[in-house]
């Protein structure tokens, strides 16, 4: 069975689950998972884990994301993007200056909190928020803490005098769990007008960039040629943030049976409860070990291979 991470280009019009289902058919395996939902109207990078790589989905999900897109000022919708029904309109009679836009984006940068939109997959009391929304219900949603590393204009905004709307073009780097739709709405609030996210493309996720992605057409061609495995990145691509420790033969005999390794064997200076190391044997990533300060040693966190 093939194991690895497929840097898929998700086209618009498909859900992330649609993509997983199609990859299962193409690669003829049920062991497939994606690393972070993209809305149907969003395209871009969607890393897909195949085979044993499904064990690293959580690490890909935890990685930061980068997007480019646009925010249109002057109206709001139920879904915070162009798919919803219009619920508010306020003419932008005079376009905001570049400095005003920059200042609004700056207010959204750093450690901030968000309230997930009603049209989202977040669960409250066991139900998806979008299920409440489709029933016409609004429920209290828990705040989430996120980090916006960068939020900038990528080109000059445009103004449509006929509709009295203004469109801002941006790039954003953010932590997991960020709703860019909600960022767009909040930018409008800072500027004093309703707003929607009018376009979005994911540029980076899980260490993969847009120019590294492959399309379904390319995948199908490789499947026909018998070379589909060549499209898969190794599992350790998802774990590049963790320091590597190369094991001796003796250490590997212990580790493959789930034994601990000492603080000295972990080779890290002043490890703490957040310290993890990736253990490598014969150039193959075998597992992740986490440090236990109370025991002053490393214990298994995730095993990838034992042979």
Curated annotation (Swiss-Prot):
Query: What InterPro entries does the record tag this protein with?
Result: PsdUridine_synth_cat_dom_sf, PsdUridine_synth_N, tRNA_psdUridine_synth_TruB, TruB_C
Any idea which GO molecular function terms this record carries? RNA binding; tRNA pseudouridine(55) synthase activity
**A GO BP entry:** mRNA pseudouridine synthesis
tRNA processing among the record's keywords?
Answer: yes
Pfam families xrefs: TruB_C_2, TruB_N
Q: Which SUPFAM superfamilies match?
A: Pseudouridine synthase (SSF55120)
**EC numbers on record:** 5.4.99.25
Q: Which reactions are catalysed by this chain?
A: uridine(55) in tRNA = pseudouridine(55) in tRNA
What does UniProt list as catalytic?
Answer: 39
Query: What are the alphabetically sorted keywords of the record?
Result: Isomerase, tRNA processing
What family name appears in the similarity comment?
Answer: Belongs to the pseudouridine synthase TruB family. Type 1 subfamily.
- Function summary: Responsible for synthesis of pseudouridine from uracil-55 in the psi GC loop of transfer RNAs.
- What this protein is called in its record is tRNA pseudouridine synthase B
Q: Which organism is it from?
A: Lactiplantibacillus plantarum (strain ATCC BAA-793 / NCIMB 8826 / WCFS1) (Lactobacillus plantarum)
Organism taxonomic ancestry: Bacteria, Bacillati, Bacillota, Bacilli, Lactobacillales
What is the gene name?
truB
């Amino acid at each position: 069975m093939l194991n690895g991470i497929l840097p898929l280009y998700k086209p618009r019009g498909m859900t992330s689950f649609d993509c997983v289902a199609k990859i299962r058919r193409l690669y003829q395996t049920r062991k497939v998972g994606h690393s972070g939902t993209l809305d149907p109207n969003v395209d871009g990078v969607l890393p897909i884990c195949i085979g044993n790589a499904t064990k690293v989905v959580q690490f890909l999900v935890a990685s930061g994301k980068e997007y480019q897109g646009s925010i249109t000022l002057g109206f709001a919708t139920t879904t915070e993007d162009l798919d919803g029904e219009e619920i508010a309109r306020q003419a932008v009679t005079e376009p905001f200056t570049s400095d005003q836009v920059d200042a609004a984006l700056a207010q959204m940068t750093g450690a901030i909190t968000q309230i997930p939109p009603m049209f989202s997959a977040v669960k409250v009391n066991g139900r998806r928020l979008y299920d409440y929304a489709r029933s016409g219900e609004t429920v209290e949603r828990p705040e989430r803490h996120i980090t916006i590393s960068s939020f900038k204009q990528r080109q000059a905004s445009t103004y449509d005098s006929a509709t009295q709307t203004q469109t801002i073009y941006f790039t954003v780097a953010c932590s997991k769990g960020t709703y860019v739709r909600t960022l767009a709405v909040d930018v409008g609030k800072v500027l004093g007008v309703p707003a929607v996210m009018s376009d979005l493309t994911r540029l980076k996720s899980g260490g993969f960039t847009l120019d590294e992605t492959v399309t379904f057409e390319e995948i199908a061609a490789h499947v026909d040629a018998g070379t589909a495995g060549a499209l898969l990145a190794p599992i350790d691509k998802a774990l590049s943030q963790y320091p590597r420790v190369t094991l001796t033969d003796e250490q590997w005999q212990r580790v493959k049976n789930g034994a601990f390794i000492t603080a000295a064997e972990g080779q890290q200076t002043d490890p703490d409860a957040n310290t993890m190391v990736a253990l490598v044997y014969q150039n193959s990533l075998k597992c992740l070990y986490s440090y236990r300060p109370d025991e002053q040693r490393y214990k298994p966190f995730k095993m990838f291979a034992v042979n």
